[in-house]
């Protein structure tokens, strides 16, 4: 594991490109806002809100990249706490669930990131899928009130898996010993973030109607967003340990996982009768912005760990 978490030149180049893209996106949003005058469409308002959230996320990432591994872990501890809170606030629960929920926030979350911090991969991998999966129903059952037991327990388990377990795979990338890779692992982490989040942007820009689950996003948007994200990953191969072909395959894999992860989370929101998980970013929540990453990060981590370490 490398400890030299300065800001490499490659990271600076990528961030410069991100800031340029965000500046163009901001100018485009302001242009259409002024063009429409007082009757600004919801699409323009949503676009400007999304761009503002991307600015916040990008600046937070830049600061944590400067701080290093500790800053990145702290950032995702906060992200897991925020996303779990957003998720739990929308699933059915009553007083009998309080102890189980407290266990998730104040025991499982700190433990999971402690294992990330200490590079305890075996416990990091099994704490939530094995021990928490078995323990949470036991704690819930001890509280009594068997009404909708399976439904309520499954929702809490799902929330813990997505918001704690899956998100914790982002900072744990920094702990890998990658063969023949001269750059700090933080560069590889940036590669994953850029490709996955760009897929979200491309899908949003090219979304079409017609899906029964979520009208704004359909397979036609996947036909555009996934190839563009894969092309971007191929162009960024030089900051990774991958060859251009490997970067393309990896980009395709995480783009697919990110797209369908977003689809799954949108389907869950529809089933709960909500449009967004919250309003941390004006019109969207933290989980709304990170849902694709929740699905892409674990797959990316394990592929890199098994084939490049």
What are these regions (language model features)?
Residues 261-276:
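Transmembrane alpha-helical segments of integral membrane proteins
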